C-alpha cells in the first residue's frame, strides 16, 4: 500500500506500524541547557526502570531532535534517552560560529548536567551523519564522559586528510516543489 501524503499528520500515519504510533504518543520533557553562546534545546524521556544508562541521539546537518521521536522510546526499558537540537538547528539558539568542537562541547555539557542531576552512570551517544562526527569528537576529546558511541552514515576522514587538497563537487540549485506529493514522488 502506498503511503498517501496529506496536510494532516494523523491521516499520513494512518497505516504506520503500531510501534511507530505508540512511540510518537510518548511525549518527552523539553529541556534547555543555558549557555552564554546560545541555549541548547533537547528532549528527554525517562527510563521506565530507573536505569543508570543514558543514550543521547544527535541528528545530522539541517535536522532536529524531533527526527528521533519514533526511535528514542524504543530504548526506555533500559535507558534514559535524550535527543538534542544542535546549535542553530531545531529549537536551539543560533551562534556566531559553528564547528564540530562547538557541537561536541554542547553534548559534553548536557552529559555533565545529566550526571550531576540524576543517577546516570553509563553514557552512549548515537550520531547520524554530522551527529556521528560530533559523537566522534566527544569520544576522542572527552573520553571520561562517555562509554560508547554508535555512528550512522558518517564519513570518517583518514589521518592524513588535508582539507586544502579537498575538492568538492559543484554546488546544486535548491529545488522547490509545489506540494508534498511531488516531493514524495521524487524519491520513488
Listing of model-derived features with the role each one plays in the protein:
Residues 69, 108, 136-140:
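Short, hydrophobic alpha-helix immediately C-terminal to the catalytic nucleophile
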Amino acid at each position: 500500500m502506498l503511503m498517501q501524503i496529506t496536510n494532516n499528520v494523523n491521516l499520513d500515519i494512518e497505516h504506520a506500524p503500531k510501534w511507530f504510533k505508540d512511540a510518537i504518543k510518548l511525549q518527552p520533557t523539553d529541556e534547555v541547557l543555558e549557555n552564554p553562546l546560545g541555549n541548547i534545546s533537547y528532549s528527554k524521556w525517562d527510563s521506565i526502570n530507573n536505569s543508570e544508562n543514558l543514550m543521547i541521539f544527535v541528528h545530522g546537518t539541517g535536522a532536529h531532535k524531533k527526527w528521533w521521536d519514533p526511535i528514542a522510546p524504543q530504548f526506555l526499558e533500559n535507558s534514559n534517552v535524550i535527543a538534542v537540537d544542535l546549535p542553530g538547528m531545531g529549537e536551539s539558539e543560533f551562534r556566531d560560529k559553528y564547528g564540530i568542537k562547538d557541537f561536541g562541547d554542547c553534548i559534553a555539557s548536557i552529559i555533565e548536567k545529566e550526571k550531576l542531576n540524576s543517577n546516570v552512570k553509563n553514557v552512549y551517544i548515537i550520531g547520524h551523519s554530522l551527529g556521528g562526527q560530533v559523537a566522534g569528537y566527544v569520544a576522542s576529546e572527552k573520553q571520561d564522559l562517555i562509554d560508547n558511541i554508535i555512528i550512522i552514515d558518517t564519513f570518517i576522514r583518514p589521518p592524513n586528510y588535508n582539507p586544502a587538497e579537498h575538492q568538492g563537487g559543484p554546488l546544486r540549485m535548491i529545488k522547490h516543489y509545489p506540494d508534498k506529493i511531488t516531493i514524495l514522488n521524487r524519491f520513488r
